[in-house]
Amino acid sequence: LGQLGFYINQSLCTGCKACSVSCKDKNNLDVGINFRRVYTYENGSFMEQPGGGIVHNIKAFYYSISCNHCTNPKCLPSCPVGAIFKDKDNGVVTIDQEICQGTQLCVKACPYGAPQYNKKVFKSNKCNLCIDLQEKGEDPVCVATCPMRAIEFGPIDELRKKYGNVSQIKGMPSDTITNPNLVITPHKDARLSSS
């Protein structure tokens, strides 16, 4: 298969959070722990008209993000006990719950906020691209539940060939930090980052 990754069509995302809720449900995550998050981006301004009144050019759009299973994951070398692994076949980055000691250094190292710390079990965990579902021939739960079909997954080379190479938009960390395995079709009103 090669390196797996996500494709996000930001122009289709309505911010409904079905992806986030289904991920939370599948992984039985406590309040405050989200392996997939949906952010709202807003831009524009209000302008006063010379004769009175106000007009606006306010735009809002949404972005769904989880672990990007980066080529150069900052979480991996940050773990002092070696609990984080990048699969050599599919590139999926996972945290071994048997080894994790909850130092939270991975949480601090990831520019995307992917690892989430669970205070109840004193361990960090994150998206594993629903490897268990993939082994049964199913899509990751976030992909399967998106009513707008704004999320896809697959070999990143194929996704890039099909959708291009945009992996950073306004409000996101520089894609040069970790080389995320992510492709984005930006919303028409999104201002692309200058990377």
Across the structure, where does each feature detected by a protein language model lie?
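Non-ligating segments of multi-cofactor redox enzymes
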Residues: 1-195
